[in-house]
Amino acid sequence: MATVKVTLIKSMTGRIPNHKLCVKGLGLRRIGHTVEVQDTPENRGMINKAYYMLRVEG
């Protein structure tokens, strides 16, 4: 299965609680942290919800 690199580029402070949970669900902890996640519909949904805080490659 394909993977996607996701990087947190903006702070989670003051964001919508559900968007914070999506970022945590992707495994991101701090600004500049990058993780590789499987390209599944579930992960795509979390990425799409919090897109304004993330950089996605691949």
From Swiss-Prot:
> Does the keyword field hold Repeat?
no
Query: An example Gene Ontology cellular component term from the record?
Result: cytosolic large ribosomal subunit
Q: Which Pfam families match?
A: Ribosomal_L30
Tell me the GO molecular function terms: structural constituent of ribosome
InterPro entries in UniProt: Ribo_uL30_ferredoxin-like_sf, Ribosomal_uL30_bac-type, Ribosomal_uL30_ferredoxin-like
The answer to whether the entry has keyword Ribonucleoprotein is yes
SUPFAM superfamilies membership? Ribosomal protein L30p/L7e (SSF55129)
> Which keywords, in A-to-Z order, does the entry hold?
Ribonucleoprotein, Ribosomal protein
Alphabetically, which GO biological process terms does the record hold?
A: translation
Going by the entry's taxonomy, the superkingdom of the source organism is recorded as Bacteria
Q: Which family does it belong to?
A: Belongs to the universal ribosomal protein uL30 family.
Oligomeric and partner information: Part of the 50S ribosomal subunit.
Which HAMAP family does the UniProt entry name for this protein?
Ribosomal_uL30_B
What is this protein called in UniProt?
Large ribosomal subunit protein uL30
